UniProtKB/Swiss-Prot annotation:
Active site: 147, 149, 154
Record keywords: Hydrolase, Lipid degradation, Lipid metabolism, Secreted, Signal, Virulence
Main localization category: secreted
Organism: Rickettsia prowazekii (strain Madrid E)
Gene name, Swiss-Prot/TrEMBL: pld
GO molecular function: phospholipase D activity; RNA endonuclease activity, producing 5'-phosphomonoesters
PROSITE patterns per UniProt: PLD
GO cellular-component term (any): extracellular region
Known role: Could be a virulence factor.
Protein name: Phospholipase D
UniProt superkingdom: Bacteria
PLD phosphodiesterase domain ranges (all copies): 142-169
Pfam families: PLDc_2
InterPro entries: PLD-like_dom (IPR025202), PLD_domain (IPR051406), PLipase_D/transphosphatidylase (IPR001736)
Class of enzymatic activity (EC top level): hydrolase
Length: 205
């Protein structure tokens, strides 16, 4: 009886494994076809990338929170701007960064900003304060969220990372900021900025 039970168990396990393998193979075949099909073609997608090896001659700086201090790091870079600042932001509620941007605009620096639509309703967003300072602010109309955190300064510096331009990012969260001084990289980020600008809406109040 024991040998029959063992045989039955062995056959059952083999049967289950066979079904599982069949499902796996079929699923792999199915998703491979989807990826290769015209409806989900990766070969036709235009992908802009930048090889990290090309950054070997670039000046790269980093900042991390905690401890606090990355807001000051960003403000210092904005204060050094001479010609232009192009910015993309999800959260935009930090007073120090906002003041630095307004001061840059007042001293003749071209300041252009794209924000996520959530800033239209966020209580602490600086959107309207920036608008009142005559800064060109647009709302990125991407179907999801505009989650970029990017500042391009004088077409040669890129500030990016996980850091939202908010007090929480500096005082409460674990975040990172990276500053890369590289004209080619800045050009790549500018191309993306302008591509998002073409699908953005102006803010009226």
């Amino acid at each position: 009886m024991k040998s029959k039970n063992n045989k039955f168990i062995a056959v059952s396990i083999s049967f289950i494994l066979g079904i599982a393998l069949g499902i796996y193979v079929e699923s792999t075949y199915y998703f491979t076809n989807i990826i290769n099909s015209k409806s989900f073609s990766l070969s036709n997608a235009q992908i802009n990338y930048y090889s990290i090896s090309e950054l070997s001659r670039s000046n790269v700086s980093t900042c991390f929170t905690p401890p606090a201090g990355c807001t000051k790091f960003i403000v210092q870079q904005i204060e050094k701007a001479e010609e232009s600042i192009y910015m993309q932001a999800y959260g935009m509620s930090d007073s120090l960064i906002t003041t630095a941007l307004i001061n840059a605009q007042m001293r003749g620096v071209k300041v252009r900003i794209l924000l996520d639509r959530s800033n239209l309703k966020q209580k602490f967003s600086k959107l309207y304060e920036l608008q009142q300072a005559k800064i060109d602010v647009g709302i990125d109309t991407v179907p999801g969220i505009a989650h970029n955190k990017v500042i391009i300064i004088d077409k040669k510096k890129v500030i990016t990372g996980s850091f939202n331009f908010t007090v929480s990012a500096d005082k409460r969260n674990a975040e990172n900021v990276i500053l890369i001084e590289d004209r080619k990289l800045a050009e790549s980020y500018l191309q993306n900025w302008f591509s998002r600008k073409t699908t953005s809406n102006a803010v009226h109040f």
